[in-house]
Each structure stands twice: as C-alpha cells, then as structure tokens.
C-alpha cells in the first residue's frame, strides 16, 4: 500500500520553499498492517485529518505528552474516518464495507490488559499509565504506533470496540471531524457552563471553533467571548454562537474580557466566567 512515512531521517534537501522539516516525510510503498488480533479490524482510510500535533511534529515541535512514547518511523494520522475492509473473527456489530469513525486511543484494553490501570478504570484512557507496555509498541494513539499504521496510509488497523458506525445522514467531511469535536465535547462535559455564564474561548482555530459549538450544544444560554486572530475566524465564531469577539491583534485581551464580565455584572447578573484555552484544552 501507499503511505506517508514520518521519520527523523531526512530524505534529501526540501528546498527553500518547502515547509520546515518536510523532508522528514516521504511517500512509500509499505506492507498493509497485519496486526493479527481477532478483536481488531482492518480499515481502508477515507479521510484523515491534519491535527495541530501533526503540524508540530513536522515543524520539529513534538507534543510533550506524546513524543516520549513512540519511536520513528510511523505513519501519522489519528483523526480517522474509514471503511471496514476485514474483521477479526470475534468482532461483533460491524461488517465489511461499513463506514466508521475511530477513537484512536491505545490504552490498557487495547494493549491486552484485563485489569485496567487507575486512569482507565475511572474512564480516562487518554492518560493511561501503560502506554509503553503490553502487546503494542509505545504509543498513545493510532497514528503514532508501528503496528497499527495511521490514516495517512491506505490502510490501518483498530480495535473493533473503538469503531463507531456512521449513519448515511452524516457525510464524509463532517464525519472526519468527529474525533477532534469529541475531544472538545469531553472537555465541556467535564466542566459544563452554568446558565448565562460567560465563557472565554482563547483561540479560534479548528479546536476553538469546535469548543464554541460544544459549549452551545451543552448549555445554549451560556455567553461566549472568543479571542480570534483573523477576521474570517471571528466570522465563523459568531456564526457558531459567540456573542462577543476579541481581536487578539489589536485589543488588550484580558482588559477587554474584564470589561465584558463587568458589563454582565452591571445588568444585575453574577459576572462569573471561565476560560477555555483552545490550544491545549485547559479549562
């Protein structure tokens, strides 16, 4: 199969007009992943997103939470949409040809442990304690694991229980955004806004905009101030429900946010507020 391989090895001079470190990528013919596990599935990649962490790797700025836990070379791509190509004999509820969205997490269950670590036991597999152990190479997600491959290849493998069938009403483009949106939705559900609360979203890239959508879905009455860098980002933030827009290139951000909080208080409402940092999902 064809796949984009990411390695620390450089494959020639990228030239002055290329992206930083683009020479660490190459298109190559590689074997289809053959992780023989009767509870896993082989998936044909349809769309794979380019995450901020992927861009960081290409620019030589690895994600601190993930970089120590995998070894090059890898096939990137963890924002996944695909079509099932083959099933392990113990996989149930799925069929060949089915479109699926994939949770790329590789935690205790995926690594073959029957007794989960404390984080997995409490529903937090994203911070599993065993990301270097078990039946898989060290990695936190599909797309950083040697055995699984990733969405930047024609095929990859995934656990059957991490595959979620998609209805026909959801198109491929929308479905390709499910993984990053779920990250935002989880953050909002962990710290849901109160009624009419002012929530400040710092950043209006893809994750910032998805945070706005998630906030409005969970608590439609919350008021959102979005700190945006570019006019087109501000327009999209407004379309998704942001009532207040802060221009990070011209406004004094925290002063402007303080003014918004005080204005809410002047209306006789409690000026409580919280902040979402879209770049790191910290709240």
Q: Predicted regions span which residues?
A:
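Short N-terminal strand-loop motif that marks the start
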Residues: 1-79, 150, 154, 158
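Glycine-rich beta-strand-centered segment in the early N-terminal region that forms part
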Residues: 31-48, 63-121, 167-169
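NAD(P)H dinucleotide-binding glycine-rich loop of Rossmann-like/cofactor-binding domains
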Residues: 67-69, 108-202
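Redox-cofactor binding/interface segments in oxidoreductases and associated redox assembly factors
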Residues: 102, 201, 247, 276-277
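Short amphipathic alpha-helix with an adjacent loop that forms part of the alpha/beta core around
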Residues: 252-270
């Amino acid at each position: 199969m064809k796949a984009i391989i990411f390695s620390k090895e450089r494959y020639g001079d990228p030239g002055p007009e290329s992206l930083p470190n683009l020479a660490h990528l190459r298109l190559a013919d590689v074997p289809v992943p053959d992780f023989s596990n009767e509870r896993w599935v082989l998936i044909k990649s349809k769309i794979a997103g380019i995450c901020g962490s992927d861009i960081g790797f290409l620019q030589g700025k690895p994600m601190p939470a993930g970089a120590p836990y995998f070894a090059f070379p890898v096939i990137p791509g963890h924002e996944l949409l695909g079509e099932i190509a083959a099933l392990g004999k113990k996989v149930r509820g799925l069929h060949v040809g089915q479109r699926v969205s994939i949770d790329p997490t590789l935690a205790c269950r995926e690594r073959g442990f029957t007794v989960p670590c404390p984080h997995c036991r409490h529903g937090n597999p994203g911070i599993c304690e065993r990301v270097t152990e078990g039946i898989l190479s060290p990695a936190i997600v599909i797309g950083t694991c040697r055995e699984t491959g990733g969405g930047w290849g024609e095929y990859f493998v995934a656990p059957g229980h991490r595959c979620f069938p998609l209805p026909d009403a959801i198109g491929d483009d929308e479905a390709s955004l499910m993984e990053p949106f779920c990250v935002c939705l989880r953050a909002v559900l962990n710290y849901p806004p109160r009624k009419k609360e002012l929530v400040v979203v710092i950043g209006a890239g893809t994750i910032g905009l998805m945070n706005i959508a998630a906030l409005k879905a969970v608590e439609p009455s919350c008021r959102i101030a979005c700190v945006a860098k570019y006019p087109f980002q501000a327009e999209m933030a407004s379309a998704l429900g942001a009532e207040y827009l802060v221009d990070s290139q011209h406004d004094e951000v925290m002063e402007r946010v303080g003014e918004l909080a005080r204005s809410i208080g002047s209306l006789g409402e409690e000026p409580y507020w919280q902040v979402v940092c879209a770049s790191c999902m910290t709240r």
